[in-house]
Amino acid sequence: MCYNIEGMNGEIKEKAPKIFNQISRYNPDIVFITEYSEQDVLALDTLLKKQYPYSSEDLHNEGSYFYGKHPLSQAQRLKDITSGEYIGVFLCDAYVNNDTIRLLGCHLFSNNYDSSHIRVTPDSIRNNYEVLSYIKNIKWASEKRQKEAQTAARMIPEGCQALSMGDLNDVCGSKTLRVLESAGLKDAWWEGGLGYGATIHHPLPYRIDHIMHSKDLKLKQINIVDSEGVSDHDALYAVFEY
């Protein structure tokens, strides 16, 4: 399961029981959570640790975490190979029985931030100049996401069982997803989902959260998990056979 819980607004302490119940309802073996603020870590972490004894605790200050029922390697946040800057991709290996599954948790760069990391949203646009500026920013952010995806793709050795999951901030068919597909990953929703599969609904419905898998992991089912107002994103849940 992957879930952007919109936790940077400081409200997770109140929402934690509902988020935990949503996750528990599906009982996934692995959960990747994004937008998890440092001050709210304990509220949800305490609940999840009852069900998930393994977690990537060293990522707590980065707002993205893995939780697992199976042992996890020490997670690492990847860096851009050219600039050396940290990117929104987190690597971790899960040890399931006698197999190793590579996990790539993603929270890729948003269209709603410019090169100075200043938040700019469609709702804040006031004139034609800002429309053009936002369109240019979309192009710049898209290129940045492609580079993030390229870095992630390099971490998938040939023949490796792998899952990529999270908020990619990009849609099916985008260059970002095509980069990951070129590394041998398949779009789980495209393969087995029902309907459009939007995971955000404002300002327009889009599927920007994705689970992608290597071909040796056979998809059994994939579902949208309604956030029920807890987050601006719905979660994604998938079942695989290997």
Where are these regions (language model features)?
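N-terminal, active-site-proximal structural segment of metallo-dependent hydrolase catalytic domains
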Residues: 1-47, 64, 242
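Active-site-proximal beta-strand elements of phosphoester/diester hydrolases
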Residues: 1-9, 100-109, 131-135
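Active-site metal-binding loops of divalent metal-dependent hydrolases
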Residues: 3-5, 36, 108, 167-168, ...
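Active-site environment of divalent metal-dependent phosphoester hydrolases
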Residues: 8-11, 38-42, 61, 111, ...
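Structured beta-strand-rich core segments of catalytic domains in phosphoester-bond hydrolases
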Residues: 34-118, 223-225
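His/acidic metal-ligating clusters that form di-metal
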Residues: 104, 141-165
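A solvent-exposed, charged loop/short amphipathic helix patch at secondary-structure junctions
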Residues: 117-139
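Metal-dependent phosphoester-hydrolase catalytic domains
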Residues: 153-162, 168-242
